[in-house]
Amino acid sequence: MIGILVSIAVTAIIFKYTESELTWSVIKRANWLLLIVAFLLQVSFWLLWALRMKLLSNYLGYRISFFHSLEITMASMFTASITPSSAGGEPVRVKMLSDRGVEVGTSAFIVLAERILDSMYFSTALPVFLIVTGFSTSFGFKIAIIFITLLLVFLYILYRIFRNESSIDKFAQLLYKAVRKFNEKKAEKYSSTFSRELRRFREATIKMLSDSPSGILVLYLVTLVMWSASFAIPSVILVALGYDAYFLYSYTAQLIIVIVSLVPLTPGSSGIAEVSMAYLYSNFVPTNVLGVLVGLWRLITYHTNIFFGAISVNYSLIKSKFVKNQLT
């Protein structure tokens, strides 16, 4: 896969230019138990993402088991890792949720709500950590301002689309015209579906905001803990290699990296994430350990997504074929 090759190539280049005799001694004395802890933090990230999806579904009146939520999460992690800006994960989650009996419009709301929760956390946490640490202040604040501006514009567009029934009809008509340009038969077939699912999306939004205000707080806290687990991984790796954790600096850098990685250039942000990490961490981590740190971090946070995600995808395919065979 292109993403894996780019990730390995860029990591190898970083390792080559930062390697020294000390690098190899660092690798030899690495605490493998702590590296396992770093991997378990990644596992907890998956589990918390699945928990958040289950809670969102429950708040909207759907009962999806935690196992199914985890299955959906891992399958989407796989597709996100092989598509630019991780964009492939969202359609997979919508499809798999709808396969579990959730309407398409409601499934789309659940997936979009996940991303809005993430964005809310990033946009509130990054300025706070930049002020507290004073790390990469100029660059970090530019990233924060751009990200918050885009988030507000996106939320305003959503409000304009879903504020009332007539605006939904207008947007549905625009979708119909756009699809008709590429495939007239499909546009005619799904013309009524556009409006129906957009209305369900609006209903899910209203239900969530009116019926579950405390649920939104719970979801935000789950989001905070989920990303904190992921952002703690580099600090644990550093301790495993015999260095200080630099937790606050590392957390701030991770917030910047996750936002920069949203730029849709390469599958799974391969190359972008590695270079961003090397650049930011070079401000407080010794140069000779950068290559090892970047390599282990991407192995734990990216390559495991592909490996375990692929297992989940294959499991889902085998299970669906088995069910079909049982029915026929």
Swiss-Prot record:
It is a multi-pass membrane protein. The chain crosses the membrane at residues 31-51, 116-136, 139-159, 221-241, 245-265, 277-297. InterPro entries: L-PG_synthase/AglD. It is found in: Cell membrane. Signal peptide: none annotated. Keywords: Cell membrane, Membrane, Transmembrane, Transmembrane helix. GO terms for cellular component: plasma membrane. The keyword Transmembrane helix applies. It comes from the Archaea. It holds the Pfam family LPG_synthase_TM. Belongs to the UPF0104 family. This is UPF0104 membrane protein AF_2231. The lineage of its organism: Archaea, Methanobacteriati, Methanobacteriota, Archaeoglobi, Archaeoglobales.
